[in-house]
């Protein structure tokens, strides 16, 4: 969660649908980067710091609405470290083929953290929403490569040799 607009809008949509169709409401979980977690810490962060640049927000615009959504849904908000975010980032890219920016992976990191601590509800469907494509933050992807990007001569042999070196 950065400015908390998404979780607020999602909750509003769920409530409106529930009121029209009498559906069950979900329990909402929100995760902020540890270095930019004003809602978790209940204080404005003057100089937020995190690798997850899209959620590097020290004073969210929808702060109170997000707290209301979490309270009304009996949900929770927690923080995740940059290391947990990067672990989730690599897991999603490597195992699932999902290339999303680090900020989006805060939700995955949070679910992993809840699962490891035994706090994830058992027998429930869990949905994590990843809104940001990995191309929004290519520097993180490049920094994690084992085989660094380099200019190649424009010939088939060089390209094949480079690809074989990456596999």
Feature-to-residue mapping (PLM):
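Catalytic phosphate/nucleotide-handling subdomain of diverse soluble enzymes
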Residues: 108-167
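Active-site nucleophile and cofactor-binding loops and adjacent substrate-binding regions
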Residues: 1-3, 81, 98-104
């Amino acid at each position: 969660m950065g400015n908390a607009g998404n979780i607020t809008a999602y909750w509003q949509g769920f409530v409106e649908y529930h009121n029209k169709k009498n559906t069950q409401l979900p329990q909402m979980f929100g995760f902020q980067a540890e270095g930019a977690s004003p809602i978790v810490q209940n204080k404005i962060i003057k100089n937020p710091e995190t690798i997850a640049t899209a959620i590097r927000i020290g004073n969210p615009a929808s702060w109170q609405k997000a707290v209301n959504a979490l309270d009304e849904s009996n949900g929770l908000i927690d923080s995740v470290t940059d290391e947990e975010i990067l672990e989730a980032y690599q897991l999603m890219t490597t195992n699932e083929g999902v290339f999303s920016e680090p900020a989006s992976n805060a939700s995955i990191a949070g679910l992993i953290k809840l699962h490891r601590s035994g706090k994830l509800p058992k027998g429930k469907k869990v949905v994590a929403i990843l809104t940001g494509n990995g191309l929004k933050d290519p520097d993180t992807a490049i920094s994690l490569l084992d085989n660094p990007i380099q200019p190649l001569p424009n010939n088939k042999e060089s390209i094949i040799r480079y690809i074989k070196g990456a596999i």
